């Protein structure tokens, strides 16, 4: 079994802009265009069984939309090997409810990104989020 454990996708209408911003802000060269269909084609070509999508909330207000997309992605594409994690921002004070909801909806884990979320991995907010994620059986 081959698993690509670090992929990103965006809704088709946002993909070009999001990929462009990542390239510009992080100096990241993308090999695909950020669309689920491109990841699926790449998986097939490379013999990848599963790809894990790791969305990132760069603002506290983004978690609802991003996590709704993650749940929809899992419901729609899990059978074809795409599994999306959820996300949370360290400034989300209601992190317990967010994590509990992700777990209830079958999302397997969360993506944290200290650089894009402008904090450090040992930030006490992250430590609280990680502990709560563990308590909710999230990776």
Which residues does each predicted region cover?
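An N-terminally biased module of ancient metal coordination in phosphate/nucleic-acid-related enzymes
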Residues: 1-55, 60-61, 124
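Active-site gating/metal-coordination segments in enzymes
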Residues: 49-50, 60-139
């Amino acid at each position: 079994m081959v698993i690509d454990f670090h992929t990103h996708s965006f809704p088709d209408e946002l993909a070009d802009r999001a990929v462009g911003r990542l390239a510009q802000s992080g100096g990241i060269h993308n090999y695909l265009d950020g669309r689920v269909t491109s990841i699926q084609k790449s998986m097939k070509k490379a013999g990848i069984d599963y790809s894990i999508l790791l969305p990132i909330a760069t603002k506290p207000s983004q978690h609802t939309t991003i996590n709704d997309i993650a749940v929809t992605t899992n419901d729609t594409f899990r059978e074809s090997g795409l599994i999306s994690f959820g996300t949370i921002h360290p400034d989300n004070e209601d992190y317990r409810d967010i994590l509990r909801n992700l777990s209830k909806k079958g999302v397997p884990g969360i993506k944290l990104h200290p650089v894009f979320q402008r904090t450090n991995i040992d930030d006490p907010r992250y430590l609280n989020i990680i502990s709560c994620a563990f308590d909710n059986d999230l990776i």
